[in-house]
C-alpha cells in the first residue's frame, strides 16, 4: 500500500499552457520555492517578459521547435524526465543527461473554442488538436507516484500550499492524476464527436454538411452526489452533472437547507423547474411524480407568485401533498409562509430565495430549499437521453415553443382573446405532462390535469374528474392535448363538460371529423403543428 501522507518535494517543473489563467502567480510561487522551470513557446515568453526565470525546452533538449510548433516537447529528455521511475531508472537517465521533472502544468489547445467559431473548417480544427500536451499529461499521470500533473488552474493554490508544507502527498498526486485522465478523456471525446459528424463521402473539408449525431457519442458527467438509494430503496444511485455548466437548472442549483436530495427529488424538481421556465410572467408549478398537478400564472400587479401559488395549489390539493414547488421569481417571505403553513412540501426551488423566505422555511428543517439563479429568455439547445437495454436514445431537447401568432384556427368559431391566452398557457403545461396528456385551464390556471393514460379520451375524463373534485368550474375552460385526437370522442367528451376551446397539434387522418365535432359543439379549435409527447 502506497504511503498516502509522505510528501515529495518538487525541484523541477515543466509549464506549457494554452489557458494562462493564474499561471504567472503560480510560476512566481514555484520560483520563490526554488523550483527550476522549463517552458515552451508562448508560455515561456509570458514568463520571461514578466520576470520569471525559465529555461526554454528547446535549449534544454538541444532540439529546436519545428513544423510550426507541431514538434517541441516530443523528446526523450522531456518524456524520460517525466516517465522515469525514481530509484529504478536513475542510471539510464544519468547516462542520457535526462533530468527528472517532478511537476507538469499543462492545459490543452482550445479545440472546443475553435470549432465553435462560425466558419471553422477542418484544417483549422486539425491544427488545434493538441498532441504534445496530452502526451505530457498522460505521461505525468501514469507516473503519478513520482510526478504531479496539474491541468486545472483551480489546483494551483493547493499545490503551492502543499509544497510550502514540504511537498505533495501521494493522495494529492493521485487526485491530480485522476483529474488529468478525466481532462484528456473529455478532450479526446470532443475531437471524436467533431470528427464523427463529418460525412467523408460529401466533403472532408466542409463543416457545413455535417451529421447532427457523431458516429460515437462522447459526453462527460461529474459525480455530484451519491444517494441513499435510487427510484426505489433496492436500487443504488448517484447524481452526475455535466462537466460544462449550462443555464440555471437542477444541476446548478445551490441547496440552502433541508435533507439531502433523493433520486426522485432531483427528477421531480427538474420537471417542475423546466416547466416554470416556460412562463415569462410570475408563475408557480407544483409537481408530483414528474407531472405538473397545479400550474398558475399571475401578473405582478394582480398578486404575482403569492397568488399563483394559491391557484396552483387549488388545482389538486391532494396531489400537492409532498410535492415539488417551483417559481420563476424570487421567493418572498409571505409566499414561503403560505406554503409551509398549508402543506407538506419536499422541495422549493426558485431563481433566488429572499432572506425573509429563508427565515420562514428554517422552521421546517426537512424542507429542501434550492436557489438556481436566473435563466436566459431563449432556451439553450442540447441533448436528451433515454437509456434502453443495451443502448441509448439521443435526441435534441424539446425547446419548441409557440405563440398566439403560430396558431392555426381550424373551426368556424375563432377563439376569443382570453381563450387564446388560456390556450397558449395550457399548451405550455401540456408539454410537461406525461403522455397521453390533457390539460384543462381557465384564466391561466390549471383546473384539471389528465396524465399518462394509454387512451387520450381517458386522460380527458381524468382531467374533468380532477376539476370536479377540486370544486373548479370546467364550463368555459380550454383544453390542451399534447398530440392529435385520433377520433372525435375526445372533442365530444370536452363538449359534455363545457370546454369552450381546444389546442392540439393536428395531423390526424381524421382531422376533418374532429373539426366537425368541434363545430357542432361551437368549440373553437386551433392547431399548433407541433407535438409534445413525453414518456
From Swiss-Prot:
Known EC number: 2.1.2.3, 3.5.4.10
Region forming the signal peptide: none
Gene3D superfamilies xrefs: 3.40.140.20, Methylglyoxal synthase-like domain (3.40.50.1380)
Catalysed reactions listed for this entry: (6R)-10-formyltetrahydrofolate + 5-amino-1-(5-phospho-beta-D-ribosyl)imidazole-4-carboxamide = 5-formamido-1-(5-phospho-D-ribosyl)imidazole-4-carboxamide + (6S)-5,6,7,8-tetrahydrofolate; IMP + H2O = 5-formamido-1-(5-phospho-D-ribosyl)imidazole-4-carboxamide
Gene Ontology MF: a single term: IMP cyclohydrolase activity
Chain ranges of the MGS-like domain: 6-151
GO-annotated cellular components: cytosol
Domain of life: Bacteria
Pathway per the UniProt entry: Purine metabolism; IMP biosynthesis via de novo pathway; 5-formamido-1-(5-phospho-D-ribosyl)imidazole-4-carboxamide from 5-amino-1-(5-phospho-D-ribosyl)imidazole-4-carboxamide (10-formyl THF route): step 1/1; Purine metabolism; IMP biosynthesis via de novo pathway; IMP from 5-formamido-1-(5-phospho-D-ribosyl)imidazole-4-carboxamide: step 1/1
CDD domains reported in the protein's UniProt record: IMPCH
The keyword Hydrolase is assigned to this record: yes
InterPro entries: AICAR_Tfase_dup_dom_sf, Cytidine_deaminase-like, MGS-like_dom, MGS-like_dom_sf, PurH-like
Swiss-Prot/TrEMBL GO biological process terms: 'de novo' IMP biosynthetic process
Keywords: Hydrolase, Multifunctional enzyme, Purine biosynthesis, Transferase
UniProt note: domains: The IMP cyclohydrolase activity resides in the N-terminal region.
Family: Belongs to the PurH family.
Family matches, as HAMAP family: PurH
Protein name: Bifunctional purine biosynthesis protein PurH
Organism encoding this protein: Pseudomonas putida (strain ATCC 47054 / DSM 6125 / CFBP 8728 / NCIMB 11950 / KT2440)
Lineage of source species: Bacteria, Pseudomonadati, Pseudomonadota, Gammaproteobacteria, Pseudomonadales
